Regions:
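Short beta-strand segments
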Residues: 5-9, 44-48, 97, 126-128
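Short, active-site-adjacent cap segments at secondary-structure transitions
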Residues: 12-14, 50-55, 103-104
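Short hydrophobic/aromatic-rich motifs at helix boundaries and adjacent loops
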Residues: 2-5, 54-56, 86
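Loop/turn-to-beta-strand initiation segments
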Residues: 40-44, 120-123
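N-terminal glycine-/serine-/threonine-rich phosphate-binding loop
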Residues: 1-42
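N-terminal active-site beta-alpha-beta segment that forms phosphate/nucleotide-binding
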Residues: 27, 35-36, 42-43, 49-56, ...
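Ligand-binding beta-strand-loop-alpha-helix segment within the catalytic cores
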Residues: 58-124
Length: 128
């Protein structure tokens, strides 16, 4: 079966306002992911974080760009935690990874571990 990388915009998770996480939108994405997963399609999902944090207004106020980027990375992790929880509640085995390890919360991304998870039929969620 083929493997696909799915990019979900953080703003899309926020619904019409593009802010926060709208449960119905998250459920819809889970429906689509579940349908593909049930067909045997291997999925890695990359999440944005624009629904929870946009750094442009802080950068305009003088915030260091790197700090803003780090805050955006944390926003993607929060979206990943939500998606991971919604998928698991449906019985879909998924594994959440972050470019920045957060021991006790999110495993640090490792290519081999993520690839093995996909080969084992898990949905891989990539954040950070």
């Amino acid at each position: 079966m083929p493997a696909f990388l799915l990019k979900l915009s953080g703003e899309a998770l926020g619904g019409e306002a593009g802010v926060g996480i709208e449960p119905e939108i998250l459920k819809h994405y889970c429906d689509e992911i579940e349908a593909a997963h049930r067909e045997g399609i291997k999925l890695a999902v990359v999440l944005g974080g624009g629904n929870l944090f946009r750094g442009a207004h802080l950068a305009a106020a003088g915030m260091d760009r790197v700090i803003g980027d780090r805050m955006g990375m944390l926003a993607t992790v929060m979206n990943g935690l939500a998606l991971n929880d919604f998928l698991r509640r449906r019985g879909i085995v998924s594994q959440l990874f972050s470019a920045v390890p957060m021991p006790g919360m999110v495993e640090g991304y490792n290519r081999d571990t993520a690839k093995a998870a996909m080969q084992n039929g898990e949905v891989v969620i990539l954040t950070g």
